[in-house]
Regions:
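A generic structural motif
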Residues: 31-33, 112-118, 181, 221-227, ...
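ATP/Mg2+-dependent ligation/transfer catalytic cores
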Residues: 1-205, 247, 394-454
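Catalytic-core signal marking the mid-to-C-terminal active-site face
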Residues: 7, 20, 233, 240-241, ...
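Conserved structured core elements
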Residues: 7, 40, 124, 143, ...
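Short glycine/proline-enriched loop/turn "hinge" motifs that connect secondary-structure elements
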Residues: 96-103, 141, 206-211, 258, ...
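Acidic, His- and aromatic-enriched active-site or binding-groove loops in soluble protein domains
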Residues: 164-189, 224-235, 239, 273-279, ...
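Broad gene-expression machinery/nucleic-acid interaction feature
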Residues: 24, 104-108, 144-148, 214-216, ...
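Histidine-centered divalent-metal-coordination microenvironment in nucleic-acid enzymes
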Residues: 148-162, 208, 212-220, 252-273
Length: 454
């Protein structure tokens, strides 16, 4: 069981502020896109006021598009409602230093309305609710995420000015597992690893990947909410460190026509004693609860794809032979399947291979828990494992577009029962906003094909 001692205590923060080592405190929450939104406070003001009373933020922060434009269709926040505030309450268990920003500490916030009720559609609250349901069964979810990213020698400003085209990757060829290839940018990778350690994350390893400039840094699994918070902190911190080093990196799911950036999510279940309950002497070494839990993943996978692949670009990863899944199938250590069972005994777990680097971890893990509970509560039977190439199989396919995924989500009785109508409608509208924006956009592809030749 993970140690719940925060990386930095309030008493330690008081001492660091008094000594002048900390002068800034960031309070932030994950938004719908998984980005950290919040404020930077003078440290003394934070200790005197915000620590005890929280702060406020405009509730449009959970009702805007990626460009921060106000958009229609959200029940909780609109022009008609006046775009008021919600409260941001610091979760003291998340207090930590952020070494990549001098003199700075950070906390993650929970959101509540002025009457004290939680903001139901907030990603952190959505995950909390599913973890509470899991706890009613005496279970805790242990989760690890594996984020890939591509590093470019261009700065973020240069990338913007170039419309993100023609950028120079940090490596020129496939460096999957290459020690020589990763050595090209080891100073950057080492700084990210070490400064994430300083922020309280437990780094396991780093390796190269297939797309030129593509890398992965892996962190030790932890309880679900801890992992998801750290995932968001890591993504923000890695980008900030890259910017400080004069380079850029992207976690977008599919930057080009080569391998996309994945975010495989591993999940296991433990009981009150910290014992992994997914393993026993049953078929494949899997316990009955794991078989039901995994069957629930299969049953809800298409309906919950919006949580695993939330953007238009997300679905361009799902190509045959790309190591991104296309089939709703499970297998033992089979990377062609959407769900891969790995480990044995106390390390028994499953991996969901759908999410890309653009995933909101709080929403995705909430989906995994809700799907698993559906399987457990309905006592679903697990079908036979896929033992061959799932890409060429007759299994049902994952959705191929955001539009398809959004329709499945909107009409899913499993989603409505697990998350409630408010959450289902909120994230259906998020997809609608993205689809409307994309449908109205004139793309480079259209210009190349039509400017002269049509």
């Amino acid at each position: 069981v993970a140690d719940r001692t925060p990386p930095l205590s309030v008493e330690e923060l008081h001492a660091l502020v008094a000594s002048g080592e900390i002068d800034t405190v960031v309070l932030a929450f994950p938004d719908m896109q998984g980005r950290l939104q919040g404020k930077r406070f003078a440290a003394r003001f934070f200790l005197d006021e915000v620590l005890h009373h929280g702060t406020e933020g405009c509730n449009y922060l959970l009702a805007v598009d990626t460009d921060m434009n106000t958009v229609d269709g959200y029940e909780m926040s609109s022009w008609d409602r006046g775009y008021g505030d919600f409260a941001m309450h610091p979760d003291l268990s998340t207090l930590r230093r952020v070494p990549w920003n001098a003199g700075t500490a950070m906390l993650v916030a929970d959101l509540a309305w002025n009457n004290g009720s939680p903001v139901v559609a907030a990603p952190r609250q959505i995950l909390r609710r599913q973890l509470e349901r899991l706890a009613e069964h005496g279970l805790t979810a242990q989760v690890g995420t594996e984020l890939e990213f591509i590093v470019f020698k261009d700065t973020y400003e240069q990338a913007w000015d170039a419309n993100y085209r023609g950028l120079t990757p940090a490596n020129q060829y496939n460096i999957d597992y290459s020690v020589l290839g990763t050595g090209r940018i080891e100073p950057l990778l080492r700084r990210i690893r070490n400064e994430m350690t300083g922020a309280g994350l437990t780094v396991e390893s780093a390796k190269g990947e297939c797309n030129p400039g593509q890398h992965e840094i892996v962190f030790k699994y932890d309880e679900a909410l801890v992992t998801c918070d750290q995932h968001a902190i890591y993504k923000t911190g890695a980008k900030e460190i890259a910017a400080q080093e004069g380079v850029s990196l992207t976690f977008m799911a599919k930057y080009n026509e080569r391998e996309g950036n994945s975010c495989h999510i591993h999940l296991s279940l433990t009981d009150a004693d910290g014992t992994n309950v997914m393993a026993d002497d049953g078929p494949g070494g899997m316990s009955p609860i794991m078989r039901h839990f995994l069957a629930g993943q299969l049953a809800a996978l298409r309906d919950f794809s919006l949580l695993y692949a939330p953007n238009i670009n997300s679905y361009k990863r799902f190509q045959p032979g790309s190591f991104a899944p296309t089939a709703v199938a499970w297998g033992h250590d089979n990377r062609t399947c959407a769900l891969r069972v790995v480990g044995h005994g106390r390390s028994m777990r499953f991996e969901n291979r759908l999410p890309g680097g653009d995933v909101n971890p709080h929403l995705a893990v909430a989906g995994l828990v809700a799907a698993g509970l559906y399987g457990v509560e309905q006592k679903l039977e697990l079908p036979e494992a896929c033992t061959g190439n799932a890409y060429t199989s007759e299994y049902e396919h994952v959705p191929t577009t955001l539009r398809e995924a959004a329709e499945l989500w909107e009409n899913s009785p499993i989603a409505k029962a697990a998350f409630g109508d408010e959450v289902v409608a909120h994230y259906r509208n998020m997809a609608r906003v993205e689809l409307d924006a994309f449908d109205a956009a004139v793309t480079d592809w259209e210009l190349r094909r039509s400017f002269e030749r049509m």
